[in-house]
């Protein structure tokens, strides 16, 4: 299971949608899952099929959002994001006792690596990991607590009122008018060299990549600004 866990830690980095209030939105998360599915090795496919009872990665990619309204799973809500000031670092900033996106991903990986974990636990944490890796590459999930990751920044998207988080979450993706399978089919194929480069990264590396994109957004976006592409 270690190789399977590590696969999910790098494959999401270069997906189409890694440039979401629910994360990437349903279409974005499904597209991410569909793209990841293309790069599965035979062994990984076999292991995932066992855990997901034949369902695809895209099929379960929104699981972590779907359980948000269930009080039984409220403790996992803080795992969808991580916030700290731009002038600080993740390592130096005080950590929330409730956890964050980095804690969530690491926890999921540890469960998948644990040979003593039950299938039920592995299935749950695999579904969560699939979703969280999508969140990790949505810049506003590595944002500012003061405005709730851009949810409180009002902007206009093609002259219609919305907020910055929603634009990145779903508006831009929905504007293409494509299904998640069409988005995945039009994604550039990764070369072996690109995959090797991605594998060298860490969760923290990828988090800071998204953080830089988030910084750029805050430097260029003004409240009530009209956005388009």
Question: Language model features by range: what are they?
Answer:
Residues 1-24:
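Bacterial Sec-dependent N-terminal signal peptides
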Residues 21-132, 139-229:
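N-terminal, motif-rich segments that launch catalysis or mediate targeting to/interaction with membranes
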């Amino acid at each position: 299971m270690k190789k399977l866990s590590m696969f999910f830690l790098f494959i999401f980095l270069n997906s189409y949608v890694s440039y979401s209030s629910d994360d990437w939105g349903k279409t974005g998360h499904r597209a991410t899952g569909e793209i990841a599915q293309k790069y599965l090795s035979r062994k990984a496919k076999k292991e995932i099929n066992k855990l997901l009872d034949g369902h695809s990665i895209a099929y379960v990619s929104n699981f972590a959002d779907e359980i948000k309204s269930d009080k039984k799973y409220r403790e996992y809500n803080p795992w969808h994001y991580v916030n700290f000031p731009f002038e600080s670092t993740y390592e130096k900033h005080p950590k929330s006792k409730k956890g964050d996106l980095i804690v969530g991903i690491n926890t999921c990986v540890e469960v998948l690596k644990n040979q003593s974990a039950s299938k039920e636990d592995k299935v749950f944490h695999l579904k969560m990991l699939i979703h969280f890796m999508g969140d990790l590459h949505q810049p506003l999930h590595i944002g500012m607590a003061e405005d709730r990751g851009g949810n409180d920044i009002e902007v206009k998207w093609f002259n219609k009122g919305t907020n910055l988080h929603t634009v990145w979450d779903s508006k831009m993706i929905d504007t293409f008018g494509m299904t998640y399978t069409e988005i995945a089919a039009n994604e550039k194929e990764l070369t072996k060299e690109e995959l090797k480069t991605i594998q060298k990264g860490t969760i923290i590396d990828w988090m800071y990549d998204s953080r830089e994109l988030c910084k750029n957004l805050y430097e260029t976006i003004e409240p009530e600004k009209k956005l388009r592409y």
